[in-house]
């Protein structure tokens, strides 16, 4: 057997390049430079095992590398790592003594020898994957020289491989037996090729001899004709007789040679049949070993799964131990749960009572709405009365100022009157002038008396009665409000807001009244000026006095109403302030209670969830029904073990049954082939009668030999 070391690396690279072209990848792969970027090799690996070399792995290989040798080296490193991982993880093999390719030489210098080593690793992945029969068949269809180099590369690579798990003796023996069978198969194939070549040479010799025989027969016929025309051939002294004897001896020699070649041909045919049988047996053994290797791989996977499940079992046992330790704290948790349940019942009772109070508050809300409407109406009335009072107060002040100014005017007129009296006495004018002076002096006296009477008429009993009634209603409303503390908090708050709004409105109205007061004051000043201008006219002064009296009356009434309303407002303000403070205190207390309730509810929920989780994870032997998940897991483990044992038994049973069936099928097929072969030989011998000539028998033997491989091929392929 050859070794790759005896071959030229360039020849190996060229042969493997021819093998790579059978994959029909998208990237060009005609020369060594086409393979240095690694794209072709990555696509070939994806076709070999698409599940392992998936699209994500293929996307890591950069396609547009150009002449950048660093990117080429990066791609080749990724491919080499993927091949080694595939051999270790999927094929369960490890390459020990094989020289790994130098990716730097491949990427930078396009080294054919190192590229041949890389392609040899890819070849090893192809002949060891699940679709290896397809790739081996493709190799067998290639040229003989390329096939020989590829098989030699496979043998060298397989000699360098070793299983990953050294403890798996059955897998090692199976791999050794598979290699031995592969070597025997290669030897049988080479022997078959040699025998086929020898048969071909013999066929060529037989054909040449037959042609020579036909030429001799033709020549013999010509000679016979000439003999008939010439002397008798029986006379040995004649030239024809000598020629006849010479041809007869030559014919005997040729017949002996023909018999000898026929015997050798039969021997080679028998040897070829035996070798074909051996090849079929070796192929059957190879198929059986392949199935055994697949079964060994599946058993190895099952062993890994069982090892993983045993690790899970150990982890679960550790968890069970931890749960048993946690079970010791169950008593404290139960006491905490009882305390939490008691607190929960207390909180539930409080909640029920609060809900009852809430229903009562909802029932009293309609009554509070009516009270609110009444208070709004009273406030509207109060605002109207306060407007009137402010207006009258303003008019009173203006009129008072006017009265003061008129009083000053009156004093001035009195002084003038006194001075006029003195002048009258001194001059002693006529009686008519004296009468006019007396009438002019009496008019101011009458105005003084009227002003004194206006000052006395200030009492307003109707306004006083209204204020008393409003005070009584206000007291009743306050008593009703104090009777429903928590139920009327919202209503009192709304009343407080309304009162504040009303206060703002009154302030605005007060500003408007002040403006009106300024206007009235300006009017009074104008009246005073007009009075000074028209002091000599008696009628005008009478009208002004009447207007002044009317203004004074209105001013007194407004002043009285304003004083009463101020007294009412002063009485209401402390109560209103007290009620607002009480409302704020009650709201703050209610808010604190609600926050405490929420905190207690959240704390209770946390404790309850924690207790449930701890009880759920405890050992069911000490706390029945507290942790059904652990018992369910144990039951599942036991059921899985039982199922595993039953599957193992069933697998052994089906394995033995399948082996027996395969043996029966192989033996039946072999017996049927032998019977058919014997029957065909007997028919062929029976068809050859004694009356046939030697040449006819030779032609039948040649035709049967040519048709024989066609009959044997289906049996071997099958």
Curated annotation (Swiss-Prot):
InterPro entries per record: CH_dom (IPR001715), CH_dom_sf (IPR036872), Hook_C (IPR008636), HOOK_N (IPR043936)
Gene Ontology CC: one annotated term: cis-Golgi network
Q: Name one GO molecular function term.
A: identical protein binding
Q: Which family does it belong to?
A: Belongs to the hook family.
What are the boundaries of the region Required for association with Golgi? Answer: 553-718
Record the organism. Answer: Homo sapiens
| Residues with the Phosphoserine modification | 3, 6, 238, 693, 707
| Localization per record | Cytoplasm, Cytoskeleton; Golgi apparatus
What is this protein's name?
Protein Hook homolog 3
Q: What does this protein do?
A: Acts as an adapter protein linking the dynein motor complex to various cargos and converts dynein from a non-processive to a highly processive motor in the presence of dynactin. Facilitates the interaction between dynein and dynactin and activates dynein processivity (the ability to move along a microtubule for a long distance without falling off the track). Predominantly recruits 2 dyneins, which increases both the force and speed of the microtubule motor. Component of the FTS/Hook/FHIP complex (FHF complex).
Recite the lineage of the species.
Eukaryota, Metazoa, Chordata, Craniata, Vertebrata
Q: Which residues carry this modification: N-acetylmethionine?
A: 1
Question: What does the record list as coiled-coil region(s)?
Answer: 167-433, 462-667
Query: Do the record's keywords include Protein transport?
Result: yes
Query: Where in this protein does the record put region Required for interaction with MSR1?
Result: 556-718
- The gene that this protein is the product of is HOOK3
């Amino acid at each position: 057997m050859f070794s790759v070391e005896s071959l030229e690396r360039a020849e190996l690279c060229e042969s493997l390049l021819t093998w790579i072209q059978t994959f029909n990848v998208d990237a060009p792969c005609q020369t060594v430079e086409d393979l240095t970027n690694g794209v072709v090799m990555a696509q070939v690996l994806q076709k070999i095992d698409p599940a392992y070399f998936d699209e994500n792995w293929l996307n890591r290989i950069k396609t547009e590398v150009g002449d950048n040798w660093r990117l080429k080296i990066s791609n080749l490193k990724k491919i080499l790592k993927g091949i080694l991982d595939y051999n270790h993880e999927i094929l369960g093999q490890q390459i020990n003594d094989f020289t790994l390719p130098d990716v730097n030489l491949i990427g930078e210098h396009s080294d054919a020898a190192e590229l041949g080593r890389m392609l040899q690793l890819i070849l090893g992945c192809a002949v060891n994957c699940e679709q290896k029969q397809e790739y081996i068949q493709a190799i067998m269809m290639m040229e003989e020289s390329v096939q020989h180099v590829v098989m030699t590369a496979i043998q060298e690579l397989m000699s360098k491989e070793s299983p990953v798990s050294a403890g798996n003796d059955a897998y090692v023996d199976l791999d050794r037996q598979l290699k031995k069978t592969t070597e025997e198969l290669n030897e049988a194939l080479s022997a078959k090729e040699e025998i086929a070549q020898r048969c071909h040479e013999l066929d060529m010799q037989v054909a040449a001899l037959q042609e020579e025989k036909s030429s001799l027969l033709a020549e013999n016929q010509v000679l016979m004709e000439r003999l008939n025309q010439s002397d008798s051939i029986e006379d040995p002294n004649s030239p024809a007789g000598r020629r006849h004897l010479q041809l007869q001896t030559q014919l005997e020699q040729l017949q002996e040679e023909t018999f000898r070649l026929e015997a050798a041909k039969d021997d080679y045919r028998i040897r070829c049949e035996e070798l074909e049988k051996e090849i079929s047996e070796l192929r059957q053994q190879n198929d059986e070993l392949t199935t055994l290797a697949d079964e060994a791989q599946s058993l190895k996977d099952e062993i890994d799964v069982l090892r993983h499940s045993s690790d899970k079992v150990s982890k679960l046992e550790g968890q069970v131990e931890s749960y048993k330790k946690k079970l010791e704290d169950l008593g404290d948790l139960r006491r905490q749960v009882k305390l939490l349940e008691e607190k929960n019942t207390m909180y539930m009772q409080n909640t029920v009572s609060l809900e009852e109070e809430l229903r009562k508050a909802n029932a009293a809300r309609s009554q509070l709405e009516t009270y609110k409407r009444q208070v709004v109406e009273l406030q509207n009335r109060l605002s109207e009365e306060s407007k009137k009072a402010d207006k009258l107060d303003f008019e009173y002040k203006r009129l008072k100022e006017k009265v003061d100014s008129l009083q000053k005017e009156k004093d001035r007129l009195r002084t003038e009157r006194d001075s006029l009296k003195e002048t009258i006495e001194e001059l002693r004018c006529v009686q008519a002038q004296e009468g006019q002076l007396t009438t002019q002096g009496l008019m101011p006296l009458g105005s003084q008396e009227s002003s004194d009477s206006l000052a006395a008429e200030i009492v307003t009993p109707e306004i006083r009665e209204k204020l008393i009634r409003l005070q009584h209603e206000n007291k009743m409303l306050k008593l009703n409000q104090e009777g429903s503390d928590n139920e009327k908090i919202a209503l009192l708050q709304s009343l407080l807001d309304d009162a504040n709004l009303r206060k703002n409105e009154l302030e605005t109205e007060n500003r408007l009244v002040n403006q009106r007061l300024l206007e009235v004051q300006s009017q009074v000043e104008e009246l005073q000026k007009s009075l000074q201008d028209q002091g000599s006219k008696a009628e005008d002064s009478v009208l002004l006095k009447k207007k002044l009296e009317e203004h004074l009356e209105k001013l007194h009434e407004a002043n009285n109403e304003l004083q009463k309303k101020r007294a009412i407002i002063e009485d209401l303000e402390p109560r209103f302030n007290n009620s607002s403070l009480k409302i704020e205190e009650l709201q703050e207390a209610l808010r604190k209670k609600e926050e405490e309730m929420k905190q207690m509810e959240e704390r209770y929920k946390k404790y309850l969830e924690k207790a449930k989780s701890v009880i759920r994870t405890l050992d069911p032997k000490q706390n029945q029904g507290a942790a059904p998940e652990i018992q369910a897991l144990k039951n599942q483990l036991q059921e899985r073990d039982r199922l595993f044992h039953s599957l193992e038994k069933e697998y052994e049973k089906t394995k033995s049954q399948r082996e027996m069936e395969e043996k029966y099928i192989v033996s039946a097929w072999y017996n049927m082939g032998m019977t058919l072969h014997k029957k065909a030989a007997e028919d062929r011998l029976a068809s050859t009668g004694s009356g046939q000539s030697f040449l006819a028998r030779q032609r039948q033997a040649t035709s049967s030999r040519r048709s024989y491989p066609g009959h044997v091929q289906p049996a071997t392929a099958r």
